[in-house]
Amino acid sequence: MTLTELKHLYAHQDLVEALVEPSINNGYIVEFRHRHGGLVPLTDIGGSEQCYGDVDSATQQAFEVGFQQVRIADEY
């Protein structure tokens, strides 16, 4: 989902957790846990998962959605 779509879900309290984890593309992805279960990835408008070069850049995207805390997943 795009940043705008995720902000909408957050505003309606449908997202309960933000997660940054390593990507197979040597970067970091941002996912959000939906209140009904499952993870929702941050994507571009074409539906491709967004990958960031460092943890701080990825974390900033979760903050943009509205979260004040972000869980950073281990690389192992």
Question: Which residues make up each language-model segment?
Answer:
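A short, charged, amphipathic alpha-helix used as a generic interaction element across diverse proteins
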Residues: 53-67
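Negatively charged, low-complexity tracts enriched in Asp/Glu with abundant Ser/Thr
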Residues: 1-11
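An N-terminal amphipathic alpha-helical segment
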Residues: 9-27
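Short aromatic-glycine-(Arg/Gly/Cys) micro-motifs in beta-strand/loop hairpins
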Residues: 21-47, 67, 74-76
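Short secondary-structure junction motifs
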Residues: 15, 67-69
